[in-house]
Amino acid sequence: MSETPIVSNHDLGKYVDQKVVIQGWVHGIRGSNARQFLSLRNSGKILQVLAEKEILGEEVFQTVKHLRQETSVTVIGNLVKNEKSPIGFELVMESIQIVGESENYPITPKEHGIDFLISQRHLWLRSSKQLAILRVRDSLSFAIRKYFHERDFLLIDTPILTGSVGESAGTLFSTEYFDLGNAYLAQTGQLYLETAIFAHNKVFCYGPTFRAEKSKTRRHLTEFWMVEAEVAFATHAENLKLQEDFVKTVIKETVQNSFQDLKVLERDPAPLLAYLEKDFPVIDYTKALEILQSKGEDIVWGDDINSEREQLLTVEFGGPVFIQKYPREAKAFYMKVNPEDPRTVLNADLIAPDGVGEIIGGSEREENYENIVQRLKEEKLPVESYDWYLDLRKYGSVPHSGFGLGSERLIAWICGLAHVRECIPFPRMMERLYP
């Protein structure tokens, strides 16, 4: 006689009207003195388990009745269809074994403050909404990789520890690196990613990046995940087309694969998908200033377009908008100077609506050796630290372009969340390094 199969909530359909073993955690319990309904979490889904005193006997039934939230258990019973249960099945319990007790679980069904929940992040991840966000994140990660692999991009794993500054020296995390001086946590994989376009034309990387920005806004983390792409021979205009297609494709695929999770989050994806049905407008930084000034904003050429002003522009255009050709002094050394207006560079930021803000930054890269050395000097960066990067401009240099997208902001937009701290399993912020 075969053993009773151990099954997960993921594939219950194969075992209807059979005796099965389910292992999981008590998500909740309710009932009467004759029967109890146990919500059992397994593989991220909730299975309803019916425990009847008449079947189990008084002693086992009382054990079930007094189970506490997050107790881990092994349950044996008969699996039946039940359209009224959360996932269409119900387990009629025959026996139960307690695997691990759970005493005084701190996150109860009552309301808790966000600071408390973040401090209990290692436990909060078990909640239905947080699990839904994790699944959306997983779906987005899959969609990103699928997009690039289907278009012949090669994944390049870029280093986390680096001796070169990728963005701003003022936002670096540094550490001593043996006898070689300081090493830095990577702000971007871009410089290393550029090396690989000479081998494979189209490449991307996807991993954690770090910014020591003293910012406490709802859009900033000190550690976040960024996907970056580089394409040999690509112009600024071609780069914009790639970015728009990339964003639209991965959002649509993620939403399609996350319908139930978005339902848990009470996120109606229809308004989000509607944004994707039209072309994203592209406006120059100078034009953006003119629009803002017409709305009474006190802003002059060279000023930063802050998050509030970004949102004014998304309202003006009714959705996402590219702002291109920013002042060169405000942007990184590797961005190509705009030949039509040397005050600016050939870059663009994609600004998302609904308070999300910038989700992509991209540019055409400077391919000329002398020009990029000059830009390094302007930024007061040590040229010798970039010898390896400058070699790329000596041996078969070509025009090329690329971009970077912060996945947490995109997740926040897809899920309709106000703060990026819930979009990564363990958020790192100015005031948060635990757990």
Swiss-Prot record:
This enzyme's EC code(s): 6.1.1.22
Entry's localization field: Cytoplasm
Principal EC category: ligase
Gene3D superfamilies: Bira Bifunctional Protein, Domain 2, Nucleic acid-binding proteins
Keyword annotations: Aminoacyl-tRNA synthetase, ATP-binding, Cytoplasm, Ligase, Nucleotide-binding, Protein biosynthesis
GO biological process annotation, one example: asparaginyl-tRNA aminoacylation
Record-level GO cellular component terms: cytoplasm
Molecular function (Gene Ontology), one example: asparagine-tRNA ligase activity
Catalytically driven reaction(s): tRNA(Asn) + L-asparagine + ATP = L-asparaginyl-tRNA(Asn) + AMP + diphosphate + H(+)
InterPro entries cross-referenced by the UniProt entry: Aa-tRNA-synt_II, aa-tRNA-synth_II, aa-tRNA-synth_II/BPL/LPL, Asn-tRNA-ligase, Asp/Asn-tRNA-synth_IIb, NA-bd_OB-fold, NA-bd_OB_tRNA
Highest taxon of the lineage: Bacteria
The keyword Hydrolase appears for this protein: no
Main location as per UniProt: cytoplasm
Family of the protein in this entry: Belongs to the class-II aminoacyl-tRNA synthetase family.
Subunit structure, as described in the record: Homodimer.
Official protein name in the record: Asparagine--tRNA ligase
Organism ancestry: Bacteria, Pseudomonadati, Spirochaetota, Spirochaetia, Leptospirales
Gene name, Swiss-Prot/TrEMBL: asnS
